[in-house]
């Protein structure tokens, strides 16, 4: 397996970064995960635009143009012969020696790019059967719109869910539902798709954006606004979405069944529309038997 370190492809076991890298010491950087189907990137431009936007919000300069970055990632995918999988890439602010919270005034730090590509098949069974979630207080910072390397709050929530045999932790600030530890959450109520507004309290997921777009195109009403824990528990359907899990239904929340405990009809419809977008961009998909 080869990985990308700046503009070089190297064997994973030979890849190194400096111990004084601010990404390692502070989590000072941004990242993206881009999905591949049939060896083709899906919603690549949207992901890369968000990467550069996240970097701009923290005054981090990505040391490559978008065109150069695309060429590097294409080489990474080809070298590892990825068909259906994920590309993880991150850019840190770079090396500062000695370590200091304050950035140096006399010279700009040079950002460090790393990336890896792995084969990860689609989990068709999960898309249909779904899984459970827990609810957890959202204790993260107030700039969740930045896809930052700082993920400790997400990690703690996700692992708490895992310990309770749940797929996800649905986060809330008081009564207001925001998103999940590693995905967005949406509900269906009276035929309306309801999801939190794209503000500083959530990451505006790329899959979330595609879902909203296909819903509107196909006559499903969309409401981008706050909803409460009560709304969540009384929803007709609940699903989570992200680059890696596509659209996955939530059948139980905190041990309580959602509606009839099965994937709802609008969730199924939205996933069909979503798959149509994938096929349009990347070609026909192989389905798990």
UniProtKB/Swiss-Prot annotation:
EC number: 2.6.1.21
Origin superkingdom: Bacteria
Binding site for substrate: 31, 99, 101
Keyword Transferase: yes
InterPro entries, per the entry: Aminotrans_IV, Aminotransferase-like, BCAT-like_C, BCAT-like_N, Class-IV_PLP-Dep_Aminotrnsfr, D_amino_transT
Record key words, sorted: Aminotransferase, Pyridoxal phosphate, Transferase
Annotated GO biological process: D-amino acid biosynthetic process; D-amino acid catabolic process
First and last residue of the signal peptide: none
Gene3D superfamilies recorded: 3.30.470.10, D-amino Acid Aminotransferase, subunit A, domain 2
Catalytic site: 147 (proton acceptor)
A GO-annotated cellular component: cytosol
Cofactor: pyridoxal 5'-phosphate
Molecular-function annotations in GO: D-alanine-2-oxoglutarate aminotransferase activity; pyridoxal phosphate binding
SUPFAM superfamilies: D-aminoacid aminotransferase-like PLP-dependent enzymes
UniProt-annotated binding residues for pyridoxal 5'-phosphate: 50, 179
Catalytic reaction(s) noted: D-alanine + 2-oxoglutarate = D-glutamate + pyruvate
Function summary: Acts on the D-isomers of alanine, leucine, aspartate, glutamate, aminobutyrate, norvaline and asparagine. The enzyme transfers an amino group from a substrate D-amino acid to the pyridoxal phosphate cofactor to form pyridoxamine and an alpha-keto acid in the first half-reaction. The second half-reaction is the reverse of the first, transferring the amino group from the pyridoxamine to a second alpha-keto acid to form the product D-amino acid via a ping-pong mechanism. This is an important process in the formation of D-alanine and D-glutamate, which are essential bacterial cell wall components.
Record-stated family: Belongs to the class-IV pyridoxal-phosphate-dependent aminotransferase family.
Quaternary context: Homodimer.
Protein name stated in the entry: D-alanine aminotransferase
Organism: Listeria innocua serovar 6a (strain ATCC BAA-680 / CLIP 11262)
Gene symbol of the encoding locus: dat
């Amino acid at each position: 397996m080869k990985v990308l370190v700046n503009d070089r492809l190297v064997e994973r076991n030979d890849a190194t970064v400096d111990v004084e890298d601010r990404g390692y010491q502070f989590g000072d950087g941004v990242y993206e995960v881009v999905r591949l189907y049939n060896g083709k990137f899906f919603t690549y431009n949207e992901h890369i635009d968000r990467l550069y936007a996240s970097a701009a919000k923290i005054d981090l300069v990505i040391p490559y143009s978008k065109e150069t970055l695309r060429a590097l990632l294409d080489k990474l995918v080809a070298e590892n012969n990825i068909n259906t999988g994920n590309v993880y890439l991150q850019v840190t602010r770079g090396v500062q020696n000695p370590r200091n919270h304050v950035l140096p005034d006399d010279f700009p730090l040079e950002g460090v790019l790393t990336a890896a590509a792995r084969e990860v098949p689609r989990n068709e069974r999960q898309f249909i059967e779904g899984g459970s979630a827990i609810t957890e207080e959202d204790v993260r910072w107030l700039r969740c719109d930045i896809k930052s390397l700082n993920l400790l709050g997400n990690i703690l929530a996700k692992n708490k869910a895992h310990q309770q045999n749940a797929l996800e932790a649905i986060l809330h600030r008081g009564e207001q539902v925001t998103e999940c530890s590693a995905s967005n959450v949406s509900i269906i109520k009276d035929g309306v798709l309801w999801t939190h507004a794209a503000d500083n309290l959530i990451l505006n997921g790329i899959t979330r954006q595609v879902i909203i777009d296909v819903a509107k195109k196909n006559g499903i009403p969309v409401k981008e606004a706050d909803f409460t824990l009560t709304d969540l528990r009384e929803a007709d359907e609940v699903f989570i979405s992200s680059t890696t899990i596509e659209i996955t239904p939530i059948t139980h929340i905190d041990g309580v069944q959602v509606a009839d405990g099965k994937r709802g009809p609008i969730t199924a419809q939205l996933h069909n529309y979503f798959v149509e977008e994938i096929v349009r961009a990347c070609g026909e998909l192989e389905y798990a038997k």
